[in-house]
A protein has these predicted regions:
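Charged catalytic and DNA/RNA-contacting regions of genome-maintenance
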Residues: 1-239, 255-268, 272-320
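Conserved interaction-surface patches within small, structured recognition/assembly domains
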Residues: 241-246
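Aromatic-lined, polymer-binding surfaces characteristic
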Residues: 251
Length: 320
């Protein structure tokens, strides 16, 4: 530390180590990120005739994986728009045209990083579980892709891994597949001019938090094909329309909620500061204030689970 260096004297040798490798897919600083967009790092794996794509946003902790057919790779890259894709050199040589057409930066890792047996050990070690069945029945390609992401994070973060949510399978068959050309012409998230302004997303985005903006972008980019999911979202919209006063009050409260996901991520990587700690405290206080308001609403199951986590943090709030 600077204090220790001063004690040793100006002529003493101070040990310096590389503590982080900065890459497009591993950014956590607010000044380098769009508040309302995810910054995904992806890994693509091939095990025999099976393919899988995993992606992570270390600034928010999101970790997902999807088994897919090769024909689905282009649409998935267009949907996620990852800042960086990790893959083995042999896979890149075989499929370079797909990644070049998608316009995503790629990074090569050794074949050992994609070994499914070693990948399983990495995942179990990171999440401290005895078996991957705790998260789902991942096939070898999915396990390989997840393990490669963890290995790459271990390399770039020099052993200081971020706080990640348990891996979730995001089956591509459950959402609408939209190829890059169609997505561009529909101007879903970007206008033909290249910016966000003028797109469908910019037109309908009335969210008041950064996390809400990111969620809307993801849902708009991948429209659900599941009837129960669609009906549940419609019931929540009906709830909002039938309770205008409560919704206005809730939106006013949400405007004061900071970006908790990114604050937590920076703190877990030891890159945070007093402002991030204050954001956690303020966010928990806002959640506590929302609890009575949500109790007055005719909550659907999707909100009942969320509502249960809003309280019980008094000791932590006082400590922070």
């Amino acid at each position: 530390s600077p204090a220790e260096a001063k004690k040793r004297g100006s002529k003493s040798v101070v040990r310096r180590d590389v503590v982080r490798l900065v890459t497009p897919g591993t950014l956590t600083e607010d000044s380098l990120l769009e508040p309302r967009q995810h910054n995904f790092l992806a890994a693509f794996s091939k095990v025999r005739d099976a393919y899988a794509l995993a992606w992570v946003d270390i600034s928010t902790g999101v970790l997902c994986v999807s088994p897919l057919a090769l024909v689905q790779l282009g649409p998935e890259l267009a949907r996620l728009q990852p800042s960086e894709v990790v893959l083995s050199s042999s896979v890149y040589e075989e499929l370079s045209e797909i990644f070049e057409d998608a316009g995503v930066p790629t990074t090569s890792l050794g074949v050992a990083a994609f070994d499914s047996a070693a990948a399983e050990k990495r995942i179990k070690s990171l999440f401290d579980v005895g078996a991957l069945e705790a998260f789902g029945n991942f096939d070898r390609a999915e396990t390989s892709a997840l393990g490669a992401i963890i290995e790459y994070l271990d390399i770039t973060q020099k052993g200081r891994l971020p706080m990640l949510r348990p891996p979730a399978r995001n089956a591509s068959s459950k959402v609408m597949q939209i190829d890059a050309a169609t997505r561009r012409n529909l101007e879903i998230t970007q206008a033909l001019s290249g910016g966000r302004a003028g797109s469908l997303l910019a037109t309908i985005d009335c969210t008041v938090t950064a996390a809400g903006g990111r969620l809307l972008e993801q849902r708009l980019s991948a429209p659900s094909l599941q009837l129960d999911v669609i009906e549940n979202r419609q019931s929540l919209i009906d709830l909002m329309l039938s309770s205008p006063n409560e919704m206005r009050a809730l939106r006013d409260m949400l405007k004061a909620v900071p970006d908790l996901d990114r604050a937590l991520s920076r703190l877990s990587l030891e890159r945070g500061g007093p402002r991030d700690i204050a954001n956690i405290r303020d966010g928990l206080e806002q959640a506590k204030d929302m609890d009575p308001l949500l109790d007055r609403l005719d909550l659907k199951p999707a909100l009942e689970t969320l509502n249960a986590s809003f309280t019980g943090h008094d000791a932590l709030i006082e400590f922070l």
